[in-house]
Amino acid sequence: MEPLRAPALRRLLPPLLLLLLSLPPRARAKYVRGNLSSKEDWVFLTRFCFLSDYGRLDFRFRYPEAKCCQNILLYFDDPSQWPAVYKAGDKDCLAKESVIRPENNQVINLTTQYAWSGCQVVSEEGTRYLSCSSGRSFRSGDGLQLEYEMVLTNGKSFWTRHFSADEFGILETDVTFLLIFILIFFLSCYFGYLLKGRQLLHTTYKMFMAAAGVEVLSLLFFCIYWGQYATDGIGNESVKILAKLLFSSSFLIFLLMLILLGKGFTVTRGRISHAGSVKLSVYMTLYTLTHVVLLIYEAEFFDPGQVLYTYESPAGYGLIGLQVAAYVWFCYAVLVSLRHFPEKQPFYVPFFAAYTLWFFAVPVMALIANFGIPKWAREKIVNGIQLGIHLYAHGVFLIMTRPSAANKNFPYHVRTSQIASAGVPGPGGSQSADKAFPQHVYGNVTFISDSVPNFTELFSIPPPATSPLPRAAPDSGLPLFRDLRPPGPLRDL
């Protein structure tokens, strides 16, 4: 029996994995070090996708000579190798080793018998150790004990050296989108300045500006993380988590803004009903908690030995379901707004069409990523698609709300200093909040100024207030305004 499979070498520790030609899934770290002490005979260390002719593994392993002998196994991502042995409880060590083809140099024996493994015996405080320079999986008769340090690289370029093959291009993509979103944010601030001068800077537009600003911060932290990662192969996981939280926050702010606009807030009405406020609060709380659960699930339960996409989890599928529910709500809100205010069709028709695509883009992307994109290319492709979806959403809204006379889709036509009119008296002398309102006047009875964001009153209905202005005759049904001057024509930029 060949030395590697001698009875004395009963335990093996496979992982380091992925090989030269098969470009496997993803890896978390390109510089890995630590101490391993386990009773298990098969322990996963890390995962990395090497490029043919460029991929290189530099390592240092040390373990007590009494634990001899241990091996490092390099698995291809071929279905007959890594997927066939990982978490295969019905296979023992020899069975897991048997799928490897020795002629491909996939086994590194960490003993002095193999000079190319770089092993030598050293003594330290009376204990003899085997110190080697090359490796990845090990065997012993009573568990594993190992100090390890590995540097996994793809070429010498700053943009590829520490990156797994499935991560190529992520840093360049993030930098590109960061510059684009900075431009969008500054344009939104400029448009906001113009709108504020015309008293048309409404809460929903401020939410758009906030979403764009948070998106910029998110991409900035992603670039910092990947830039540091490209430098040292380690990165700062806290920075990446912060970037993900900001990315999710931007998405949630934008989603809330879309639902509010669909319901006509700041376009056809100045307030959301009490029932609508409660529904929005419950929905957004549920959506936020699900996002948090998804991040925790990804950090704590994703198996680094497998390639798992963010949405490939119960929390991820829950988010997809909430996205579909949000679209149904969005459709209903837009249809109701159009039914009561058909004069708003120039805004709502393209608005509905554009964001129908956006609502479906996220779940469709998740399904394609889970089932249609090769694992070794998934992370970089999904990153680009996800950022493209966010860019589409922000770019469309920026164009639709640009304050230009040529913009026929401009949604805002009531000043922030105006209060809404009283409607035509309904049965019993009550006033209707939904019917017979003049064009470009809000649907609810009261509209507060939002020159400064007032999030505490965003969705609530204020108590009736006595107006200091003279009131019209009870049966006149004429609207009352604090400022009766129209906003005036929009100027081209």
UniProtKB/Swiss-Prot annotation:
Protein name: Transmembrane protein 145
Keyword annotations from UniProtKB, A to Z: Glycoprotein, Membrane, Transmembrane, Transmembrane helix
Organism, as annotated: Homo sapiens
Membrane topology: Multi-pass membrane protein
A biological process from GO: response to pheromone
PANTHER family attached to this UniProt entry: INTIMAL THICKNESS RECEPTOR-RELATED, TRANSMEMBRANE PROTEIN 145
Record-linked InterPro entries: GPR180-like_N (IPR053880), GPR180/TMEM145 (IPR047831), GPR180/TMEM145_TM (IPR019336)
Organism domain of life: Eukaryota
Subcellular locations according to the entry: Membrane
Underlying gene: TMEM145
Transmembrane residue ranges: 9-29, 175-195, 207-227, 241-261, 282-302, 318-338, 349-369, 381-401
Residue positions with a glycan: 35, 444
Main location: membrane
GO cellular component terms, A-Z: membrane
Region (Disordered): 464-493
